[in-house]
Amino acid sequence: YLDCIKDFPLGYYAHRSSEKLLTANLLPKENIPLAKGTPLSEKETLQWIQKQQKRPGSFSNTTFLNVQKLLDYGFVENALELFQTDYAKNSKRLDFLYAYGNLFLEANEVAQAYRLARAFQNRIDRKVLADAPVSVLRFLYPLPYKERVFEKAGSAIDPYFVYSVMRQESIFDFQITSPVGARGLLQIMPATGKTLAELEGIQNFEPDNLYNAYLNIRLGIRYLIDLKQEYNNDYMYVLGNYNAGPKPAKRWQKAGEGLSWDLRAEDISYWETRDYVKRVMGNYWIYQEIWKGSL
């Protein structure tokens, strides 16, 4: 179990291994090396990042400041063009990806910010993330549209669960469309969106409305809350339904009665849905570890 946590500190199996260690009283919680985020100053965080990248030198601070100014003034396209002039020669630098990713996130250019966060995660040795600064983990697991998500989630559903679904469904790109036609941040199908809009009292709904981030969040959270009630607060089958529809999810729920979490997860017969459930729940447990108590 410890080897699994150390080798894959972010994700589903790290958490499940931790639960096994705790349940069997093999280790106290404080001795289990789950990725929780080390509190470090901004300077210490940058030093940690530069140590991991093992690349000398630095990127252009002048260009960075100019991109920042353009974003501040609302010239987003110009900012992106200027950013691209530096990206090609710095795309392998972790400090570059981190700095610009946070800059775009602060400017509410969420999709661009998360593209850089994904590039950062793909380039860093995953094992070192167990001891990563908390600001690095929060960069990889961000909270965009925070006021809207927390407002609509309320006490009916954990907002960190909503973010976990959003991260997996759309990589935080409000304009994204799936091959089967699901749209926006929480990847809602037009027919489902129409039904949800009616339930929410929204008139004159059009499928393209799902590309509106704030409406998509409203409808998506309504859908997740309804599913949570339908499946008796069991997030495993909420996700099963969200990914594969109600018929297989109901079948899996019935077959899983009385079984442990791990057996129920493995009993999901669609491998795509089984993988989806594990990825989203892995996201969720990380969000809980690194964000709870900070807001």
Stretches found by the model and what they are:
Residues 1-37, 78, 88-295:
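Catalytic glycan-binding domains that act on GlcNAc-containing polysaccharides
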Residues 55-85:
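Alpha-helical segment of the N-proximal tetratricopeptide repeat
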Residues 48-61, 85, 136-141:
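TPR-adjacent "capping" and linker segments in tetratricopeptide-repeat scaffold/adaptor proteins
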Residues 31-58:
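Long, low-complexity, highly charged intrinsically disordered regions
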Residues 44, 58-65, 95-96, 144:
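Alpha-helix N-cap/N′ positions at the starts of helices
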